UniProtKB/Swiss-Prot annotation:
Record gene name: N7BM
Broad class of the protein's primary localization: mitochondrion
Superkingdom as given in the UniProt entry: Eukaryota
Subunit structure: Complex I is composed of 42 different subunits.
Coiled-coil residue windows: none
Keywords recorded for this protein, A-Z: Electron transport, Membrane, Mitochondrion, Mitochondrion inner membrane, Respiratory chain, Transport
Cellular localisation: Mitochondrion inner membrane
Mode of membrane association: Peripheral membrane protein
UniProt entry tagged with the keyword Mitochondrion: yes
Family: Belongs to the complex I NDUFA12 subunit family.
Protein name: NADH dehydrogenase [ubiquinone] 1 alpha subcomplex subunit N7BM
Keyword Electron transport assigned: yes
Gene Ontology cellular component annotations, sorted alphabetically: mitochondrial inner membrane; respiratory chain complex I
InterPro entries per record: NDUFA12 (IPR007763)
Amino acid sequence: MSSSLYRVLRNAWEVGPRSYWKQLNSIGDTKSGRLVGTDIYGNKFYETDHQDEIHLRTRYVEYKEKDYDMSQVEPGWHFWLGYGVDTAPCNTPKEKLPIRAYPYKFQPNYTGTPGAFVTYNTLKPKISAWEPVTKQRS
């Protein structure tokens, strides 16, 4: 187990009771750190310098929405969370920002929502629902 009682109590003291309860219900652990930045969706990104954190678990995100999905994180922040770069996207100079080959606006994953893509099918269905027929009893 990665948590010690000292670590949990220290993090609870540093983040406060409201954030402590929110973290327990969302990520199942308590973390404390400095706010690095916020993306356009309102997600907050943190980094901690505590030595007792697990290696490569020192960066984390607090999602704005309760029902979150990892696709709601911008690609630059996703790369920062995965330790692809040391400088956060909000601290990167404009001349060093990457230029996308396909400069479309980023969209989150809409799977399971009313905005999900559904193909239009013109073929006859291969299966049909079973409709039971009952006979009259004599």
